């Protein structure tokens, strides 16, 4: 049996371990005016809203970063991977937000392919010593029709595997709320604004803004 001193030491160690495991990934502060690349599909491009209402534009206003909209409607993870290198070369971003995968799920592409493509996206960005924020995307199933939107678990796996910050819950909240979406799979101006606010707050949580 453990004596009192051993028990206290064991309990303290367990508490500290749990506290550490719950911490968010921390990044270095990024200077105001720096360029950030938002890589993604129609949710990034701002499908369904007017000019300046997409989330990268709204995030620019909230943070004073130059957020480049690298979203293309209809893009799969494979297509985003193919576009990535020219975007990195052109913009030389200090941070990349990766929000991709929804079209893979809608088209029922193999999960292994989506996982591999997003992993390659992260690896190519990290090869340039650029920090990555991965965004969890909802897995559209029949339950989404009644407002129960859940994120695909592969994003948790990828965030752990590549040691990157993961923003969870933002798109699920938008697409689960009729007041924030223009259709089943796209936000409206209010929804994209909400996402931008969530991302700006996440910047503070992980140290990008201090």
Where do the language-model regions lie?
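Alpha-helical cap/lid subdomain in secreted, periplasmic
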Residues: 61-62, 82-210
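Catalytic-site microenvironment of enzymes
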Residues: 5, 28-35, 63, 190-192, ...
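Conserved Rossmann-like nucleotide-binding pocket used by diverse enzymes
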Residues: 16, 68, 133
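Serine-esterase "nucleophile elbow" of acetyl-processing enzymes
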Residues: 21-92
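Domain-scale detector for complete catalytic domains at protein termini or as standalone homologs
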Residues: 8, 21-29, 119, 134, ...
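Short, motif-level signal for alpha-helix interfacial/capping segments enriched in acidic residues
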Residues: 17, 21-23, 166-167
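N-terminal secretory signal peptides and thylakoid transit peptides that target proteins
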Residues: 1-15, 21
């Amino acid at each position: 049996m453990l004596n009192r001193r051993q028990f206290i030491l064991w309990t303290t160690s367990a508490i500290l371990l749990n506290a550490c495991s719950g911490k968010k990934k921390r990044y270095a502060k990024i200077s105001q005016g720096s360029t950030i690349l938002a890589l993604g599909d129609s949710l990034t491009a701002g499908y369904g809203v007017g000019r300046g209402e997409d989330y990268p534009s709204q995030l620019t206003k909230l943070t004073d970063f130059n957020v480049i909209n690298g979203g293309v409607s209809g893009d799969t993870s494979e297509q985003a991977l193919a576009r990535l290198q020219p975007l990195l070369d052109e913009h030389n971003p200090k941070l990349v937000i990766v929000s991709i995968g929804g079209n893979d799920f809608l088209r029922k592409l193999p999960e292994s392919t989506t996982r591999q493509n997003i992993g390659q996206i992260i690896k190519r960005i990290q090869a340039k010593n650029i920090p990555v924020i991965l965004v969890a995307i909802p897995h559209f199933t029949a339950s989404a029709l009644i407002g129960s939107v859940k994120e695909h678990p592969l994003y948790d796996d990828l965030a752990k595997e590549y040691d990157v910050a993961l923003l969870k819950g933002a798109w699920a909240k938008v697409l689960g709320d009729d007041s924030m979406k223009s259709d089943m799979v796209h936000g409206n101006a209010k929804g994209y604004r909400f996402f931008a606010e969530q991302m700006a707050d996440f910047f503070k949580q992980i140290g990008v803004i201090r």
